[in-house]
């Protein structure tokens, strides 16, 4: 039985091509209004890749030698007016795998709901103020420890293709970003507190304080289904006598 388990482990290695223990990344994104990109564990950031504050710019950052267990984090803030959103494409060059905003796996934590617990801070987070890395780390640890990560929200048609129909609304980001997939979606968090009516932008992409600051995250890499199954079977067989 042990020989079978060893055979199964060998199959995993063969199927994954000797999976590297570190990943390289090349990312393109923008945020209306401000953001910082980090990599790290489920509890804290360990590397700051960069940031930006001009939604008209497509920002590009790279990261090399990141652990395969890393999460990719994007901390954001807005000016609470006009429009707000986050869009990007993230390419794992080691695996030749690409993920974009709007795909499954993305999560968001609205830190503004928990400012007293996080920082002993009453009231709301100030508009147009980015959190420090230490504050982002505190938010990540609190969200993970209390299972507070939720799925982000979007609005139909708000992708990186300005020709996608969005009636009766308007597309206020009129130019496609050249290195972001056209299927990538503008995402944000919907607090459910904006009850206003607008013919320009839908909720949650029109300006409003949806419990900012926000921290988005996505797992950097997960085992392919066949790999996960073989690993599980191998572990069971290896443990049997």
Residue ranges of model-derived segments:
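A generic "binding-loop/recognition-motif" signal
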Residues: 33-34, 234
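C-terminal membrane-anchoring or membrane-association module
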Residues: 238-241
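Solvent-exposed serine/threonine-rich low-complexity stretches and specific carbohydrate-binding patches
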Residues: 45-52
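Short, surface-exposed beta-strand/strand-loop-strand elements in extracellular ectodomains
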Residues: 34-43
């Amino acid at each position: 039985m042990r020989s079978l388990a060893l055979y199964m482990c060998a199959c995993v290695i063969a199927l994954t091509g000797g999976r590297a223990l570190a990943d390289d990344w090349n990312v393109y994104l923008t945020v209306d209004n401000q953001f910082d990109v980090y990599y790290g564990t489920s509890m804290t950031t360990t590397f700051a890749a960069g940031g930006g504050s001009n939604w008209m710019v497509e920002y590009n950052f790279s990261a090399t030698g990141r652990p395969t267990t890393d999460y990719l984090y994007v901390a954001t803030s807005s000016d609470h007016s006009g429009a707000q959103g986050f869009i990007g494409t993230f390419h794992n060059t080691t695996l030749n795998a690409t993920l974009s905003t709007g795909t499954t796996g993305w999560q968001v934590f609205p830190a503004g709901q928990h400012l007293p617990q996080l920082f002993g801070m009453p009231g709301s987070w100030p508009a147009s103020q980015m959190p420090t890395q230490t504050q982002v780390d505190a938010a990540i640890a609190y969200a993970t420890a209390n299972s507070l990560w939720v799925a982000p929200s979007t609005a139909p048609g708000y992708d990186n293709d300005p020709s996608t129909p969005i009636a009766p609304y308007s597309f206020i980001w009129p130019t496609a970003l050249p290195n972001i997939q056209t299927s990538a979606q503008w995402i944000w968090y919907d607090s459910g507190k904006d009850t206003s009516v607008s013919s320009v932008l839908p909720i949650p992409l029109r300006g409003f304080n949806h419990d900012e600051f926000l921290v988005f995250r996505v797992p950097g890499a997960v085992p392919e289904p066949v790999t996960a199954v073989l690993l599980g079977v191998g572990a069971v067989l290896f443990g049997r006598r």
